[in-house]
Amino acid sequence: MELFAALNLEPIFQLTFVALIMLAGPFVIFLLAFRGGDL
């Protein structure tokens, strides 16, 4: 458990969250365009 505590999880979670947002943005735009472009 000490090794797990040594890994600082907060920046890892933040990087994962930012990566999800960066991937979700274009995905939502692509999905809207694919469904006909109407919001």
Swiss-Prot record:
Main location: membrane
A GO cellular component annotation in the UniProt record: photosystem II
Any single GO BP term: photosynthesis
Cellular localisation: Cellular thylakoid membrane
Annotated keywords: Membrane, Photosynthesis, Photosystem II, Thylakoid, Transmembrane, Transmembrane helix
Top-level taxon: Bacteria
TM region positions: 12-32
InterPro entries in the record: PSII_Ycf12_core-subunit
Entry membrane topology: Single-pass membrane protein
Family: Belongs to the Psb30/Ycf12 family.
Family matches, as NCBIfam families: PRK13686.1
Subunit structure: PSII is composed of 1 copy each of membrane proteins PsbA, PsbB, PsbC, PsbD, PsbE, PsbF, PsbH, PsbI, PsbJ, PsbK, PsbL, PsbM, PsbT, PsbX, PsbY, PsbZ, Psb30/Ycf12, peripheral proteins PsbO, CyanoQ (PsbQ), PsbU, PsbV and a large number of cofactors. It forms dimeric complexes.
Job description of the protein: A core subunit of photosystem II (PSII), probably helps stabilize the reaction center.
Protein name: Photosystem II reaction center protein Psb30
Natural source organism: Microcystis aeruginosa (strain NIES-843 / IAM M-2473)
